[in-house]
Amino acid sequence: VAVVLGVGLACLRQAVFQALESAGPRVGVGLRVLVKPNLLTARPLACAAPEVTAAACAWLLERGARVEVADSPGFGRADAVARKIGLEAALRPLKLRVRGLDRPVPVRLPLPEAPEGRGARFMVARRALECDLILSVPRVKAHSQMLLTLAVKNCFGCVSGLRKALVHTCEGRDPDYFADCLAALWAALPPVAALADGVRAMHVTGPSRGRPFALGLIGASPSAVALDEALCAVLGLEPGRTPLGAALERRKAEGCATAGWRAEYPLLRPGDFDARGFELPRELAHTSFHPAR
C-alpha cells in the first residue's frame, strides 16, 4: 500500500504524521527501527528536509519503537552532514543523534542472472542488518546514473563508507548491473518501509547538483518498492524505465505491480499532482563514482 499526500512547507510534521498513520509500517513497542536519511552532502536539496526526518522519528517514538538514526556517506561523516543541514538540532528535542553506519560485515548478494553461487559481495553495516525495520527517508531526486533516486536506492547507504565508492567504481559503469546489485542489497536487508520528501524535489540532474522542483508531496508506505512505483506514477514514468525499477521487476520484488501488487491510495492519488516540467536526465552517465556529481 502506498500513499501520496500533498503538502506545503508550513505543515511538514502534520503531513508526515498523516501519511504514516494512513500507510506507514506497523510499529509496536520495542521494535528496533533504523531511520535511514540520505546524508549524501550538505548541499541544498541533497538530503530530505530535517523536519521530515525528525517528524518520522517522533511518530515512531510515540508508538514505542526503539529508534536509531544513521547513514554512511561515501565521503565524510554522517554526523557532520547532519549538523550542517540542521538535522542534529531537529533531533535534539527527541534525544536522538545521528550515528554512522559502520562495523561492516560481508554480505553475498545473489543476482538473478548470475551462475549459481556467484553474485556481488557488499560490506554492509551491522546496524542495518540487526534492526527489525528500516525506514528509508529520501528526497525525491533525479539521478545522473539511475535516472531517479528514491527509497530503494537510499538503501545503498547501508554499505559502509568508502566501500560505496569502490562499488561505484567497480560496478557503476553498467547501470543495469549496478541496479541488480542494489535490488539484491534491498532483498538482503530487514523489511524496508519508506517516507519520501517530495515537497521540493530535485530535477534535471542529481543526486546533488540538480535544480529545485516544487512537487508538493510527502509519500509513505510499508514497502519502499511500492512507494517508489507510486512516485514514478506521480512523475508519469513507468517504473521499468529506470534501471533500478527494471531490476526490481526482474526480481519480482514484493511491492512491484508486475509481481501482482496493487497500490491503494487512502489519501491523494498520483494523478492529483502536477509534475509537468519535472525533467529527468536526458541520458545516463555510464561512469564510475564521482563525488562532485
Each PLM stretch: what is its role?
Residues 1-293:
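N-terminal and secondary-structure boundary signal
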